[in-house]
């Protein structure tokens, strides 16, 4: 197809139907190094429609990249250093769009909205235009009263945050340098500004994790409920090591190990009788599929399809190392 051929000419794009026919090795693919956001690239949705995944929400990009290096996260490697849209450009875009269209809500696209240096004046601008706000990501240690107020004024009574673990030490090892005290403090602030529910993301199977670390998830949830009165929903997911991250060489936990941690959490959560948290546990097979997709290259896809068809669930010995070598050729 014409589109495939045109895309294949770009040095940072891999088009399997074309490239794989002659072998990936002969293509010198590289990661794009465009760092500036001041170029002629769209910063917002071209159009909105109630039939789309985000409905009438206008997606507004503020930032790319990240200054942190969380041990499990691919974002710094994928998007490079942190850089921001100029506030004047974002403000002009909001003015131009609202002059022509009725925009009920803006979705702020950014790795972490609290890192955007102009988040306060932007929220004030959107409030002035009577535009609701939704955040793609909220990091607890960057959460501000303005952000919570914007959330509640938009009609939402829930926030989503990711403590990752109930243990301060293990959270620090993950790269999130904040304590349980701060988690409770920020959620108490949210409660005082009109929020009554919180969704918390946790991981199990982290490197160095102990039974005490797993139990700490329940202990933290109990403390949040006791001190804030929030209703909690927990999303608990197995740790999946990803290429090009500090923890890329760590093991993906065995199925029985993950299931054992899940059972421990379910049992201990039942001991919370006051506003017992709702538990959502990511399926182990789903996490395994994520692991394989992260590590398999094009060459391994046929083996993956056969393994799935045969009911196999683990990455065959040696494939992960070969995938790492193949990924290195893109760098």
Regions found by a protein language model. Give the residues of each.
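Hydrophobic alpha-helical scaffolding
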Residues: 48-52, 56-64, 68, 76-87, ...
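Radical SAM enzyme core and accessory elements
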Residues: 271-331
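Conserved SAM/AdoMet-binding glycine-rich loop
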Residues: 91-233, 241
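Structured core elements
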Residues: 14, 36, 45-49, 57-65, ...
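Terminal amphipathic helices with adjacent charged low-complexity linkers/tails
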Residues: 4-11, 20-33, 80-86, 103, ...
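A glycine-rich phosphate-binding loop feature that marks nucleotide/adenosyl-phosphate handling sites
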Residues: 6-17, 111-116, 138-142, 205, ...
